[in-house]
């Protein structure tokens, strides 16, 4: 055992403070009648190995013993408070020279007068006046002690209280609501100018009209209210509550560094694995282990400080953001009040001008302020007028350009029609060389495939097209007739031309000669359609019409190719947006390379759909 004596030491299982504030109480007690406290005698020690750290166990024992002692004191305090309630005359609110610290143990009792903050919402004007705020109240003071402190201040006055305490608020806001106005007046007369002497840095916030109301009120009970004298006894009790650190709870808000604190606490029992130091000489291991622990602790401390700075910066940013929002709301409310006042003045109602509390308006008198408001309103009206005028001018220019383009297209109608006829002839020639007849001779299988697709498409769509065209003719027959009359054109000619067009669209073209005859016999209807087509501007169409037009383009491409070709859809859209319905033949020429003769039928169907739709 002698060899192991050097590795064993003796420690106390716990280490309590031997004073427990007895010296302080003995000084405060004028009679020096403080009861002696039985001090725990630690006449034994426990042997342990020096390599074992038992500091955490000793602290745990100390906490348990302290908790048991506090519970005993709380139970005694509750019993004494019950006796105090049964005998109210024993309350120490008098000015005699009794024991100053008498009844301090009574401060631990249940909260009875606390209510939630939403219940303090004022329901009438008197509730607004009787509710006050104690600002910058000490943070983390226990709630039961807050109530006991308020009771000391109120001196048996009836009240309820609540508070706001948030992690972004440095100090508490205590809300107090009195039952009667005379209690409020007594409290303000007694403590309004002296509250900071009892509780440091504390201020009382009241309604702006409370002093005026209390002074002008003719109630006899309010006139008899007199302030009370603040006694030394009361000051001593409040100082003991405020300055005792036991009366404060630990902050519950997260600091953001709890994980680092836990790691640092674990370093007291941290051990380095010897397998990691197998290459290090034994005489250097101890110093290296200490260096490792010191280095890691140092890095954790640096990270902890950095994280604290970041959290504090975020807190400041959040605080500033809330302040900016509050200022914005305040300015908006001020602007709305000013606007309402101006509107009432415009109607003819005589109102007293409301002077703004902003710094830039403080040096104005009533007349100057009215002139300032009138100038501001005039500037707003001028701005609105300029915006409306600019919008009108833009719309006027756009409409002028649209009508100018329409006039030019009508003036050049005949030359455009001749050019289109030449393109139609060229298209017919290409159809003779590259159409179905050519496929019928050289590639009969492709001819059958394309012909079957086209026939099925024509059979399903032709009937719908004819039906839609006939309905459009019935609906717009009177309007078309009047238009023809104004332009010195016979209505019968137009009707016969449209009927011929409808008849030829149902029949399947059997030869190129039939197509040529149709073009010759329908020159006048084509001219009318061209006029309508030149009036359509694709970009100016409503969104719903554009959507249906896009669906129609996708449908026609799928029917022609059997698949949805994004490239062809893009080509058609670009042509329509760039030229509207003016370059029909150009679009046909672009699509012929992919669709052959189906390109013309696709474009014709698309043009007919656009004209009927618009």
UniProtKB/Swiss-Prot annotation:
Family: Belongs to the SNU71 family.
Encoding gene (name): SNU71
Main location class: cytoplasm
Taxonomic superkingdom: Eukaryota
Alphabetized Gene3D superfamilies for the sequence: PWI domain
Any Pfam family hit: PWI
Biased composition (Polar residues): 490-502
Signal peptide positions (record): none
Official protein name in the record: U1 small nuclear ribonucleoprotein component SNU71
Biased composition (Basic and acidic residues): 73-85
Positions with biased composition (Low complexity): 503-520
Gene Ontology annotations of biological process type: mRNA processing; RNA splicing
InterPro entries, A to Z: PWI_dom
Record's subunit section: Component of the U1 snRNP particle, a subcomplex of the spliceosome.
Subcellular location, record wording: Cytoplasm; Nucleus
Coiled-coil residue spans: 301-327, 450-479
Record keywords, A-Z: Coiled coil, Cytoplasm, mRNA processing, mRNA splicing, Nucleus, Ribonucleoprotein, RNA-binding, Spliceosome
Purpose: Component of the U1 snRNP particle, which recognizes and binds the 5'-splice site of pre-mRNA. Together with other non-snRNP factors, U1 snRNP forms the spliceosomal commitment complex, that targets pre-mRNA to the splicing pathway.
């Amino acid at each position: 055992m002698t060899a192991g004596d050097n590795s064993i030491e003796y420690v106390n299982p716990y280490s309590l403070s031997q004073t427990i504030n007895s010296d302080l109480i003995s000084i405060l007690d004028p009679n020096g009648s403080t009861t002696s406290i039985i001090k725990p005698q630690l006449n034994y020690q426990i042997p342990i190995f020096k390599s074992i750290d038992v500091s955490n166990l000793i602290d745990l024992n100390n906490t348990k013993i302290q908790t048991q002692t506090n519970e005993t004191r709380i139970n005694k305090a509750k019993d004494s408070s019950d006796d105090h309630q049964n005998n109210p005359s024993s309350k120490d609110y008098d000015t005699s020279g009794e024991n100053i610290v008498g009844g301090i143990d009574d401060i631990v009792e249940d909260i009875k007068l606390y209510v939630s903050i939403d219940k303090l919402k004022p329901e009438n004007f008197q509730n607004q006046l009787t509710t006050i705020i104690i600002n910058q109240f000490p943070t983390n003071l226990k709630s039961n002690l807050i109530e006991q402190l308020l009771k000391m201040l109120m001196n048996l006055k009836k009240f309820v209280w609540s508070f706001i305490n948030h992690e972004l608020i440095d100090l508490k806001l205590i809300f107090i609501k009195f039952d009667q106005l005379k209690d409020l007046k007594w409290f303000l007369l007694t403590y309004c100018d002296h509250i900071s002497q009892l509780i440091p840095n504390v201020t009382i916030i009241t309604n702006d009209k409370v002093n005026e109301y209390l002074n002008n009120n003719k109630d006899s009970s309010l006139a008899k209210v007199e302030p009370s004298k603040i006694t030394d006894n009361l000051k001593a009790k409040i100082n003991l509550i405020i300055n005792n650190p036991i009366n404060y709870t630990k902050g519950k808000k997260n600091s953001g560094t709890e994980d680092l604190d836990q790691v640092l606490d674990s370093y007291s029992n941290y051990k380095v694995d010897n397998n990691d130091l197998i290459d290090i000489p034994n005489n250097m291991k101890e110093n290296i282990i200490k260096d490792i622990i010191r280095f890691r602790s140092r890095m954790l401390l640096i990270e902890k400080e950095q994280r604290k700075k970041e959290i504090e910066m975020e807190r400041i940013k959040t605080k500033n953001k809330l302040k900016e929002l509050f200022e914005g709301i305040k300015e908006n409310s001020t602007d709305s009040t000013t606007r309402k006042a101006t509107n009432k003045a415009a109607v003819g109602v005589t109102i007293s001008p409301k002077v703004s509390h902003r710094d830039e308006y403080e040096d104005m008198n009533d007349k100057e302020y009215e002139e300032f408001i009138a100038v501001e309103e005039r500037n707003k009206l001028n701005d609105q007028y300029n915006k409306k005028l600019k919008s009108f001018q833009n719309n006027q220019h756009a409409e002028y350009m649209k009508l100018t383009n329409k006039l030019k297209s009508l003036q050049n109608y005949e030359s455009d029609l001749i050019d289109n006829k030449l393109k139609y002839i060229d298209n017919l020639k290409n159809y003779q060389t590259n159409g179905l007849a050519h496929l019928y001779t050289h590639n009969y299988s492709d001819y059958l495939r394309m012909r079957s697709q086209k026939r099925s498409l024509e059979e399903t769509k032709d009937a719908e097209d004819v039906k839609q065209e006939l309905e459009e003719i019935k609906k717009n027959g009177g309007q078309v007739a009047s238009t023809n009359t104004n332009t010195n054109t016979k209505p019968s000619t137009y009707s016969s031309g449209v009927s011929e067009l409808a008849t030829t669209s149902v029949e399947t073209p059997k030869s190129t000669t039939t197509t040529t005859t149709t073009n010759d016999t329908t020159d006048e209807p084509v001219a009318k359609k061209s006029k309508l087509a030149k009036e359509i501007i694709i970009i100016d169409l409503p969104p719903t019409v554009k959507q249906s037009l896009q669906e129609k383009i996708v449908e026609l491409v799928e029917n022609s190719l059997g698949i949805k070709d994004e490239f062809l859809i893009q080509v058609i859209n670009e042509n329509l947006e760039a030229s509207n319905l003016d370059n029909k033949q150009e679009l046909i020429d672009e699509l012929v390379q992919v669709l052959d003769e189906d390109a013309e039928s696709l474009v014709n169907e698309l043009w007919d759909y656009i004209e009927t739709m618009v």
